[in-house]
Design a protein with these regions (language model features):
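Hydrophobic helical membrane-anchoring modules
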Residues: 1-5, 17, 25, 153, ...
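Hydrophobic targeting segments
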Residues: 4-10, 19, 26, 37-42
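A short, exposed helix-loop element centered on a Lys and neighboring polar residues
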Residues: 13
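Acidic helix N-cap motif at the loop->helix transition within catalytic regions
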Residues: 17-21, 48-57
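Short beta-strand/loop segment that forms part of the nucleotide-sugar
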Residues: 35-46, 67-69
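A conserved acidic beta->alpha catalytic loop
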Residues: 43-52, 98
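Acceptor/aglycone-binding surface of glycosyltransferases and processive sugar-polymer synthases
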Residues: 67-85, 90, 102-183, 210-228
Length: 246
């Protein structure tokens, strides 16, 4: 699959301290790639000065588009919002905060091209990945990976990395059906993709440097329980009421 343009969505929540540096670094990386591109930042709630700082950055980065809304809805909502506005031949998203090194985007796009893939997902378990994150995160990732394999039978090793790329039609077909707004939306994305027949999903190496102290108003265990509940809800919609067949 030859493609000429890329849209990259960046969901941002209370990132006023780092967002300008993050977007400048991301733009520097994308400017080296042989594609036309746009960077779509979705500010998930006007809770600090993130939106204002991005507005000030627009005159300096012509490829930057900024959207936002008053109330915080969750990462899944923000990603969906941006993905459905994107128009690139390939549409992807990457987490703000730059725990993930954007230099690996080029590798993901090469894999998309070489494999004529529907979806490329970053994976901590790819043999060429370089990851730095604590043992307790590894244990939780293993447990959640085992659960999702039992429930959904995904033929991928890691579903949760915040860097994924889709062919335009795949992105619009999948994200128009997404319901989950917060923590388990990655699982719902892959579930919907499989259900729609998009099975050409490949994993790509990443460089991950986990930064302690992610900004959220919820406790760690509240997040874990919310993810489990949302994951069960996806299973219910898939297997019981066949919501995604519509």
């Amino acid at each position: 699959m030859k493609f000429k343009s890329l849209s990259l969505v960046v969901p941002a929540y209370k990132q006023e301290k780092t967002i300008v540096t993050d977007i400048k670094n991301l733009n520097k990386t994308l400017s080296t790639l042989p594609y036309k591109y746009e960077v779509i930042v979705v500010v998930d709630g006007f809770l600090d000065k993130t939106y204002q700082k991005l507005q000030d950055l627009i005159p300096k980065i012509k490829e930057l588009k900024v959207y936002g809304y008053e109330k915080n809805h969750g990462k899944g909502y923000a990603v969906k919002y941006g993905m459905l506005k994107a128009q690139g031949d390939v549409i992807g998203f990457i987490d703000a905060g730059m725990d993930l090194d954007p230099s690996e985007i080029s590798v993901a796009l090469d894999l998309m091209d070489w494999n004529n893939a529907d979806i490329i997902i970053g994976s901590k378990l790819h043999p060429e990945s370089k990851v730095n994150y604590p043992l307790w995160r590894k244990i939780l990732s293993w447990g959640y990976r085992t659960l999702t394999h039992i429930l959904f039978g995904f033929n991928v090793k890691d579903t949760q990395v915040g860097m994924k790329f889709f062919r335009k039609k795949v992105a619009h077909d999948v994200f128009s059906r997404i319901v989950i707004k917060r923590y388990a939306f990655d699982i719902e994305v892959l579930t919907v993709a499989y259900q729609l027949g998009y099975h050409k999903i490949y994993e790509s190496p990443i460089k991950l440097n986990f930064k302690q102290g992610s900004i959220t108003s919820l406790s760690f265990w509240e997040i874990v329980m919310s993810m489990l509940w949302d994951t069960i809800a996806v299973f219910y919609r898939l297997r019981i009421v066949h919501y995604y067949d519509r």
